[in-house]
Amino acid sequence: MSAIVDIVGREILDSRGNPTVECDVLLESGTMGRAAVPSGASTGSREAIELRDGDKKRYLGKGVLKAVENINTEISESVLGLDASEQAFLDRTMIDLDGTDNKGRLGANATLAVSMAVARAAAEESGLPLYRYFGGMGGMQLPVPMMNVINGGAHANNSLDLQEFMIIPVGAPSFREAVRYGAEVFHALKKILGDRGISTAVGDEGGFAPSVESHEAAIQLILEAIDKAGFVAGEQIALGLDCAASEFYKDGNYVLSGENLTLSAGNWADMLATWVDKYPIISIEDGMHEGDWDGWKLLTERLGKRVQLVGDDLFVTNTKILQEGIDKGIANSILIKINQIGTLTETFAAIEMAKRAGYTAVISHRSGETEDSTIADIAVGTNAGQIKTGSLSRSDRIAKYNQLLRIEEDLGDIASYPGRGAFYNLK
C-alpha cells in the first residue's frame, strides 16, 4: 500500500504573475509528488470554482491562501492514510468532502492540486513515467499540437476579437517534426511582422498579438508565414480558430468591435463558413456563446461534417453537460481543461465519454500556466490525439512541448503520430 503520510499546499505564481496553488504529497516510502494548477482568463460560467481570497490588499484579491488552507487542514485530514494508487477513491473522497456541485466550498484549485500531486507520487512509487501510469501499455500516441501563433480577445490587448489563431501540423511525420514545423512558422511570422513594423510582443499564451485591420488579415499573415517557412498550407499545416465567442456575445448578437460588425448567430455562422471555404481551417473552438445552444445547433448543422467544432466554455469538461450536447447533436469535440472540473478522475471520464460518442477530446492548457507538464502526460496516456498548449515561446508553454518530446523518445519505435487522423470526427 502506497499510503499518503503528508500533504503540503502552498501559494506560488502562475505565468501571469497571479497566485495559484501547488501541492506536495509524501508517501510512506518517502516518494513525493508535486503538482501546480493553472488558471484561465476567459472562463465558462459553469466551470468548477477557483477559490480566491478576495482580499484587495493582497494580490488584487487573487490570493489563494484559503484554498491552500483547505489543503493543509480539511483535505489533508480526509486523505492521509489513503492509498495513493486508488485515484478514483481519493478523488471521490474530496468531491464528497466539498459537498457542492462546483467545488465551491474547498475550491477546484485545491482539489485538483491534490489529485495531480497524488498521481505523480503514485507513478513515482510504481516506477512508471506519468503517461504510462495514466494509460498503461496502451498510451503510445503523441498528440497533434494546435499552436496558437496569433493571440487576440482576452489573451491580448489588440484589435482582434477572436482569441486564438492556430497552426496545426497535420502533415508532419512525427511529433518532433510537428514541433519543428511550428517553430519555423513562428519565426517566419515574427520576421514578417517585424519587417512591416508590426509589434512582435506576445500574449499570454506566447503567440504574437498584432493589431491588424481584420481577422482575415491575421489569417493571411499566418498563411504567408507558412509559405515563407517552406510548408504547404492545408497539406502540411492546417489552421484552427478559438473564437471564444462568449466574450463578444452581447444582447443576442455577436459583436466584432474590431471590425465594427454586429451579427446574428446565423450571419456569424455564415462568416465562419465563408472563412472555412477560403482557408484551410479544420477546427473552430467556441464558435458560439456557451448559452446559445440554438446557435451551436445551427453551426453544427452547417459545418459539423467539415470542421472540428470544439466545445470549451460550452462543455467545461463536465460529463453532464457533454452528455446533453451529445444527445442534442451539438458540436463534435470537447476541450479538456483539468481545472474546469477539479479532479483527474472526472477529467478522464469526460475524455472517455467523448470518445465513445465519436467526439474528439483536445487536451488544453490555460492562459495562466506554470512549469507543470501534467497535461502532456494526460494527452499521451489517454491517446487523446490533440493538444493545445500555446505558441513556440514562453517557458510555461514550451515545458509541455519538451515533455512530449521526452515521451516520444521514451516510447521509441512504438510512438505514433496521428496527423490528420486525429480528426476522426470529420466525415
Swiss-Prot record:
Cysteines engaged in disulfide bonds, as pairs: none
Subcellular location: Cytoplasm; Secreted; Cell surface
Protein's pathway: Carbohydrate degradation; glycolysis; pyruvate from D-glyceraldehyde 3-phosphate: step 4/5
UniProt GO molecular function: magnesium ion binding; phosphopyruvate hydratase activity
InterPro entries, per database record: Enolase (IPR000941), Enolase-like_C_sf (IPR036849), Enolase-like_N (IPR029017), Enolase_C (IPR020810), Enolase_CS (IPR020809), Enolase_N (IPR020811)
Binding site for (2R)-2-phosphoglycerate: Q163, K337, R366, S367, K388
Any Pfam family the entry gives: Enolase_C
Residues at which Mg(2+) binds: D242, E285, D312
BP GO annotations: glycolytic process
EC number: 4.2.1.11
Keywords: Cytoplasm, Glycolysis, Lyase, Magnesium, Metal-binding, Secreted
Active-site residues, Swiss-Prot/TrEMBL: E205, K337
Catalysed reaction equations from the record: (2R)-2-phosphoglycerate = phosphoenolpyruvate + H2O
Gene3D superfamilies: Enolase-like C-terminal domain (3.20.20.120), Enolase-like, N-terminal domain (3.30.390.10)
Note on cofactor: Binds a second Mg(2+) ion via substrate during catalysis.
SMART domains referenced in this protein's UniProt entry, alphabetically: Enolase_C, Enolase_N
Any one Gene Ontology cellular component term annotated for this protein: phosphopyruvate hydratase complex
Swiss-Prot/TrEMBL cofactor(s): Mg(2+)
HAMAP family cross-referenced by the UniProt entry: Enolase (MF_00318)
Its job: Catalyzes the reversible conversion of 2-phosphoglycerate (2-PG) into phosphoenolpyruvate (PEP). It is essential for the degradation of carbohydrates via glycolysis.
PANTHER family tied to this protein: ENOLASE
Family named by the database record: Belongs to the enolase family.
The protein's name in its UniProt record: Enolase
